[in-house]
């Protein structure tokens, strides 16, 4: 199948690692990274499955499926096998479920990579979803949800999700709870294990997976191992986010809302959210990066310098927070002082006026110059960045494979 060699990939000048990109017969795309100097090995697998695919009647199912894949498969049926193996091999494993993807990853001592890949591949070939462990893990989901209820960022994001269009997948409760994953299905005459099998078989497929593997072995050895273990992952030829109708804008036209949130912990913030079309297809131009650079500027004449001078705010950040294949959310977050809270309307006017001045009244050549400077700095940062440690390298390479190489770029 298709492959890209180390020589055809762009990488930092100081990066001595060797890379290879291959596609297996089952259409699973893989980045192989060989680093003879590493003491740790790592792997990460991303699949185009996320919370937006949760059935309305079983919200949190994608997240629950992520949990269950760790709890045994036909080849390694013990519930704690993989986590235990990573732990005794000086490593760890974890996973997370987002709106439009789920990512599984691990790191451990380099000499155990071969056996770890054997175990890891079982997640995606033959999970068991045993009834006893399903019941046990429901309690883990409930505990996680109870913990999240006390976390202000999660509370704020759930509020934001609730403002989406009625019926849009963004509105769904991605974490799930005992009520949504047990009580409601039982009341409807079904059980969660049936939903798990149906979801896994209808949403997981090798052709929508991307795998990154980093080890001390040479590229040929890593490729042999990956083919040995991951060629058995079923290819159901699914579309990314199977069964979800495309909708570029989850919010109604003219979406304008203002909410006052009572936090759990003491904090004073003013946050603005601006929904935009997904920026994934614009990975080369990164249009929101220019906006982030200008608004987040901290020098004389900036929004932050004015807020500090007035004693209204101490920190300001601007950038793309939430991203998905449907939309992006550009966020401006200001840490307010106690004196600044009553002046939030003036601060809002200041921000909108600042943006209007920069992007409507500034000469075009000024913005072009700023853009050119940003491009030059990012290129220098890429070329001369220091070597990334193993777990971050594997996750970063996985993200690069998912977002960039999939679009025919040659930069890792």
Where are these regions (language model features)?
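Non-catalytic, conformational "gating/processing" segments within enzyme and secreted inhibitor domains
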Residues: 153, 193-229
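N- or domain-start disorder-to-order transition segments that initiate the globular core
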Residues: 1-40
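Short acidic-hydrophobic surface loop/beta-edge motif
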Residues: 20-25, 256-263
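Polar, glycine-rich mid-to-C-terminal structural blocks
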Residues: 266-286
């Amino acid at each position: 199948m298709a492959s890209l060699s180390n020589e055809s990939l762009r990488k930092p000048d100081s990066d001595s690692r060797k890379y290879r990109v291959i596609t297996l017969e089952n259409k699973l795309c893989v980045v192989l990274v060989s680093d003879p100097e590493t003491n740790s090995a790592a792997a990460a697998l991303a699949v185009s499955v996320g919370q937006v695919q949760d059935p309305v009647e079983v919200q949190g199912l994608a997240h629950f499926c992520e949990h269950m894949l760790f709890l045994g498969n036909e080849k390694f049926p013990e519930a704690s096998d993989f986590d235990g193996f990573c732990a005794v091999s000086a490593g760890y494993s974890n996973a997370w479920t987002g709106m439009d993807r789920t990512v599984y990853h691990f790191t451990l001592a380099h000499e155990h990579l071969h056996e770890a890949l054997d175990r890891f591949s079982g997640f995606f070939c033959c999970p068991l979803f045993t009834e006893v462990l399903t019941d046990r893990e429901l309690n883990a989901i409930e505990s996680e949800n109870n913990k999240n209820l006390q976390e202000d960022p999660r509370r704020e994001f759930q509020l934001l999700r609730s403002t989406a269009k009625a019926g849009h997948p963004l509105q769904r409760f991605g974490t799930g709870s005992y009520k949504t994953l047990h009580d409601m299905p039982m009341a409807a005459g079904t059980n969660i294990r049936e939903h798990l099998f149906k979801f896994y078989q209808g949403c997981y497929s090798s052709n929508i997976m991307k795998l990154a593997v980093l080890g001390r072995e040479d590229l040929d050895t890593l490729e042999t191992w990956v083919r040995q273990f991951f060629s058995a992952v079923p290819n159901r030829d699914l579309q990314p986010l199977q069964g979800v109708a495309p909708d570029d804008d989850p919010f109604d036209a003219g979406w304008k809302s203002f909410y006052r949130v009572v936090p759990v912990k003491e904090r004073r913030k003013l946050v603005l959210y601006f929904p935009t079309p997904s920026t994934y297809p614009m990975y080369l131009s990164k249009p929101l990066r220019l906006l982030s650079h200008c608004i987040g500027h901290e020098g004389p004449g900036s929004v932050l310098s004015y807020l500090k001078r007035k004693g209204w705010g101490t920190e300001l950040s601007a950038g793309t927070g939430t991203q998905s294949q449907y939309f992006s959310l550009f966020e401006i977050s200001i840490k307010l002082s106690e004196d600044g809270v009553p002046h939030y309307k003036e601060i809002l006017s200041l921000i909108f006026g600042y943006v209007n001045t920069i992007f409507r009244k500034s000469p075009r050549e000024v913005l072009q110059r700023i853009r050119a400077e940003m491009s030059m700095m990012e290129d220098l940062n890429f070329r001369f960045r220091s070597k990334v440690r193993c777990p971050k390298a594997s996750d970063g390479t996985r993200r690069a494979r998912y977002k960039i190489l999939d679009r025919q770029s040659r930069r890792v």
